[in-house]
From Swiss-Prot:
GO terms for biological process: proteolysis involved in protein catabolic process. The gene is cpr-1. Belongs to the peptidase C1 family. This is Gut-specific cysteine proteinase. Induction: Activated by a GATA-like transcription factor. Residues 1-15 form the signal peptide. Residues 16-84 form a propeptide. Thiol protease. Has a role as a digestive enzyme. It comes from Caenorhabditis elegans. Disulfide bonds join 98-127, 110-155, 146-204, 147-151, 183-208, 191-196. SMART domains: Pept_C1. Transmembrane segments: none annotated. InterPro entries: Papain-like_cys_pep_sf, Pept_asp_AS, Pept_cys_AS, Pept_his_AS, Peptidase_C1A, Peptidase_C1A_C. The active site is at residues 113, 275, 295.
Length: 329
């Protein structure tokens, strides 16, 4: 009898042992995740998207490519020192003549974000440094398919700093979106059905598409520097304010994938992988400081392809892996 009573008491006690709350919210997914995030905080809103974890990972890269900068990369740091920067800044209005800054591209089902972030930054900075005289739309595919192991592993991911070093040494040609203009437009079609297979890294072609009048070698655009930006918000702001958008990498969780609007701050959901993007400015919304960022998941994601992420606390590592470069003009 005593044994039975003791067993019953143990069972009752175990039933009231609290679970680890953080571990529980990290495993939330789908609509349950959206409901939790939208009720647990008011900084940003999420919406449910019918997609598998595997499909979400198609757009991301191996986390090692989004890690904080190594000592070797930190040794290249360049810092712009300014007395002050404005409370709000948007590269789209500061350099309104540069159409590329406003452009949202679509990497489709390939972890080519590192190449997109680099191509977008190169496009913007070439325009900025020439005061609008040159407005190339740089080809992510030229980096993705031709940089090879020098940059990383194609659709599995790559190092943003290596993409900029390739720009310096080998040059990069122009190329728009799928079936678009330029020498080498992106060869992977956007996923519109919601059920698309993972894409393979395209093969390197050192020739322009049929009908393009400029030869591949003549279409190259070059950089003169590739460097890291110090890991602090003030240095990143000064770099953008002085020279234009920068490329950054960070860790992605499922609640980011379901972002719809507001200032993102990781709240719940599992870790999915690394991602690279382009930071174009900053501001404050309802008292929350943010970075203004261009994603490469098409215009139907987030705030018409853009998003805001909390600024100043190295949210998801976004302030630990910022790179930039200067165009040869």
């Amino acid at each position: 009898m005593k044994f039975l009573i003791l067993t019953a008491l143990c069972a009752v006690t175990l039933a009231f042992v609290p679970i680890n709350h953080q571990s529980a919210v990290e495993t939330l997914t789908g609509q349950a995740l959206v409901d939790y995030v939208n009720s647990a905080q008011s900084l940003f809103k999420t919406e449910h998207v019918e997609i598998t974890e595997e499909e979400m990972k198609f757009k991301l890269m191996d986390g090692k490519y989004a890690a904080a900068h190594s000592d070797e990369i930190r040794a290249t740091e360049q810092e712009v020192v300014l007395a002050s920067v404005p409370a709000t800044f948007d590269s789209r209005t500061q350099w309104s003549e540069c159409k590329s800054i406003k452009l949202i591209r679509d990497q489709a089902t390939c972890g080519s974000c590192w190449a997109f972030g680099a191509a977008e930054m190169i496009s913007d900075r070439t325009c900025i440094e020439t005061k609008g005289a040159q407005q190339p739309i740089i080809s992510p595919d030229d980096l993705l398919s031709c940089c090879g192991s020098s940059c990383g592993n194609g659709c599995e991911g790559g190092y943003p700093i290596q993409a900029l070093r390739w720009w310096d040494s080998k040059g990069v040609v122009t190329g728009g979106d799928y079936h678009g203009a330029g020498c080498k437009p992106y060869p992977i079609a956007p996923c519109t059905s919601g059920n698309c297979p993972e894409s393979k890294t395209p093969s390197c072609s050192m020739s322009c598409q049929s009908g393009y009048s400029t030869a591949y070698a003549k279409d190259k655009h070059f950089g003169v520097s590739a460097y890291a930006v110090p890991k602090n918000a003030a240095s990143i702001q000064a770099e953008i304010y002085a020279n234009g958008p920068v490329e950054a990498a960070f860790s992605v969780y499922e609640d980011f994938y379901k972002y719809k609007s507001g200032v993102y701050k990781h709240t719940a959901g599992k870790y999915l992988g690394g991602h690279a993007i382009k930071i174009i400015g900053w501001g404050t919304e309802s008292g929350s400081p943010y970075w203004l960022v261009a994603n490469s998941w098409g215009v139907n994601w987030g705030e018409s392809g853009f998003f805001k992420i909390y600024r100043g606390d190295d949210q998801c590592g976004i302030e630990s892996a910022v790179v930039a470069g200067k165009a040869k003009v």
